[in-house]
Design a protein with these regions (language model features):
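C-terminal lobe and adjacent flexible extensions of AdoMet/dcAdoMet transferase-like proteins
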Residues: 196, 214-268
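Catalytic cores of RNA-modifying enzymes
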Residues: 1-212, 216, 252, 257-265
Length: 268
């Protein structure tokens, strides 16, 4: 089996700090990620940031068709040189944030070790492909993963928790210590499995309005919900009293279902 990370390290000696590159080198964890996606012959995988291809190779050897989206030209060239004999691999040299639906298969699963500084943006971008997704397995900085998977009345609960859980059922696969990467990371990571949920709002304009309301609800976390929304909703204090029996309730106390109820009471 090709030891792609070792080959890359021997050839280049370092990763590109501009892209915050840290490659997972623990083979057991790579296998665990591939297994979480239930990859088999003919599965379509869209890998965001394949790096030097260690996880990509796991997918290819299982017979999956992999569309790898990589922004770093050096890594694109490296993958093309060492994986050229796999006809089930397509490499797109671009920033994933620029990718459109027409560039990807009609149905697929996402995978990726996401750059820490862009992971939230990338996760939100995946919601644009919601109807095409079977599953997603992503690695995040541990603290970010905790916010994504947080529940109400905890310090990590935020708009990213509500919106992520609106689109997906989320399951924690495992934590991974920084020593399992090259170069080693100073922080730990967490692997999450996402399974698309049926979207409550089928009208995209209504859905976008709901998501915007959720973001505004958390804009100043120390403030009560009525203070965060009072500029948009004149009767917010009475509505909160009616729905939650608490006109001073904070956003972090409200569940996804509660936010949906609040939106419907205000706007419909």
């Amino acid at each position: 089996m090709l030891k792609l990370t070792k080959i890359f390290r021997d050839e280049f000696g370092h990763t590109d700090k501009n892209f915050a590159q840290h490659f997972l080198v623990n083979d057991h964890y790579l296998n665990e990620i591939a297994e979480a996606l239930e990859v088999s012959e003919g599965t379509n995988i869209v890998e965001i940031g394949p790096g030097c291809g260690a996880l990509t190779l796991k997918f290819l050897e299982k017979g999956a068709h992999v569309t790898a989206v990589e922004i770093d030209k050096k890594l694109v060239d490296f993958l093309e040189r060492y994986l050229f004999f796999y006809d089930n691999l397509e490499i797109i040299h671009d920033d994933f944030l620029n990718i459109d639906k027409y560039q990807l298969p009609p149905r697929f699963s996402f995978a990726g070790n996401l750059p820490y500084n862009l992971s939230t943006k990338i996760l939100m971008k995946t919601t644009a492909f919601h109807s095409c997704i079977d599953k997603m397995v992503f690695m995040f900085q541990k603290e970010v993963a905790s916010r994504i998977n947080a529940v109400p009345n905890t310090k990590d609960y935020s708009w990213i928790s509500v919106i992520s859980q609106y689109f997906f059922d989320i399951k924690k696969i495992r934590n991974i210590a920084g020593g399992n990467f090259w170069p080693k990371t100073k922080v730990n990571s967490t692997v999450l499995l996402f399974t698309p949920r049926k979207r409550y709002f089928q009208n995209s304009n209504i859905e976008n309005e709901f998501l915007e309301m959720v973001k505004k609800s958390f804009v100043t976390k120390r403030k009560t919900l009525k203070n965060n929304l009072k500029n948009d909703i004149a009767d917010i204090e009475n509505i909160l009293e009616e729905l939650f029996a608490n006109k001073s309730i904070r956003a972090e106390q409200i569940s996804l279902k509660g936010f949906i109820t609040l939106y419907e009471r205000i706007y419909t």
